[in-house]
Amino acid sequence: KPAYVSHYRLEAEEIIDLIKNSGGTPVLAHPKLIHNDALVEELLKNGIEGIEAIYPKHDEEDTKRYLELAEKYHLLVTGGSDFHGIPGRWPQQIGEFVVDDCYAEELYREPEL
């Protein structure tokens, strides 16, 4: 078809490098949705700098596991409501889901050179 553009795939390491080279901080979002803890750990070993450990769809065990991985790999801990503006889609509204200050403050630290 004339308008077809073939898809291409980047490896995780390439994406991580692109983010870092653009001045960003690569964070693994929604690790539970990967459904493969070995793959999550592999991604964490390849330059990811943070993990979304705090997420409304995580149970207590999930949150504990991802906080432990963050500590093991010296990662930033992030979290979010995953609210996309559709009322009623999620159990909470924007601003109702928060991340403890002890994790948020790490996001404001100057990077070590």
Regions found by a protein language model. Give the residues of each.
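Active-site-proximal loop/helix segment associated with metal-binding centers of metalloenzymes
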Residues: 1-8
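Ligand-binding pocket segment of bilobal, Venus flytrap-like solute-binding proteins
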Residues: 11
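Charged catalytic cores and adjacent phosphate/nucleic-acid-binding surfaces used
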Residues: 14-17, 21-22, 28, 32-113
